[in-house]
Regions:
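Alpha-helical, largely C-terminal catalytic domains
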Residues: 1-276
Length: 276
């Protein structure tokens, strides 16, 4: 979905956001509307048929809207001006634009039960989901860096944002970005070893958190093991709103800790020094 809406004009994106919310709130699409709306309606009906409660459906609708409003729309000014956000602002935006605040809810659908509202909204649970989103966003940025170094107009990647704000080399930015990632992983572990007492729901919460962590591992494995070209220079989206100007970049990038990055990506750092 992010490829479809990521370079959509803001007026169209606003209408798309409103229509998404309506459909998730049980207003069926018209036969002539795009397939993504019909798929959303079909998914919503399947979730309801499988016993997911209305408050969970409403949460999905709300968090889809936040994905567009606080994620995709917040990225647009930086894309249009080809400028960098600060590291702090970037992480806030990416926490939404990565889409995980929406899709982490599917953990409950897979479990066949929704967390009660008072548990879902507990500060510890909210923080776990925020951390999960930002960790996955950073992992996504590492997986995408080879593709994004192949174009001259990409600024929304944690490595490039860190490099720009701290005025350091690409090699140093990779190391610093890994530190940010690892600090968040440690924070998740620190919270989960000292959970609040949720009483009757404690086992459900522990199962939920287990699957939240599995999503982090699973998505990171997908980036490198699925064979997708989504994260290579062949993976640029070229919808009606944009064009592709990517260049060939013969750099192999593996897992997040792979030293091959530092040796090979350093050759490309000159492209990003001085961009404001």
């Amino acid at each position: 979905m992010d490829d479809y809406v990521g370079i959509m004009p803001l007026d169209e994106l606003k209408a798309f956001t409103d229509r998404t919310y309506e459909i998730m709130m049980e207003k069926d699409p018209q036969p002539n509307e795009i397939g993504i709306f019909r798929q959303m309606a079909a998914a919503r009906k399947e979730w309801i048929a499988n016993g997911m409660p209305l408050f969970w459906i409403e949460r999905m609708a709300r968090e889809f809207r936040e994905y567009f409003t606080y994620g995709v729309m917040e990225e647009t000014p930086f894309k249009l001006s080809n400028t960098y956000p600060s590291v702090g602002r970037y992480l806030l935006i990416r926490m939404y634009s990565i889409g995980q605040k929406v899709f982490v809810n599917l953990t409950e659908a897979a479990m066949g039960q929704a967390l009660p509202v008072h548990i879902h909204e507990h500060p510890a649970m909210n923080r776990l989901r925020e951390l999960q989103s930002m960790i996955i966003a950073i992992q996504n940025d590492f997986a995408s860096i080879r593709k994004e170094l192949a174009t001259d107009n990409e600024t929304l990647n944690i490595i490039l944002v860190v490099m720009h704000e701290y005025k350091i080399s690409l090699e140093e930015a990779i190391v610093e970005s890994l530190k940010i990632h690892d600090d968040m992983v440690r924070e998740i572990d620190s919270i989960t070893v000292c959970l609040p007492d949720f009483g009757f729901y404690q086992k459900m919460v522990e199962d939920y958190i287990y699957h939240v962590k599995i999503m982090i591992h699973g998505l990171n494995a997908f980036y490198y093991e699925s064979g997708t070209k989504r994260y290579t220079q062949e993976g640029f989206a070229i919808p009606k709103y944009g064009t592709a100007n990517e260049q060939s970049l013969d750099v192999e990038i593996k897992y997040i800790e792979h030293e091959y990055w530092i040796k090979n990506l350093k050759n490309n750092e000159h492209k990003y020094i001085g961009k404001t």
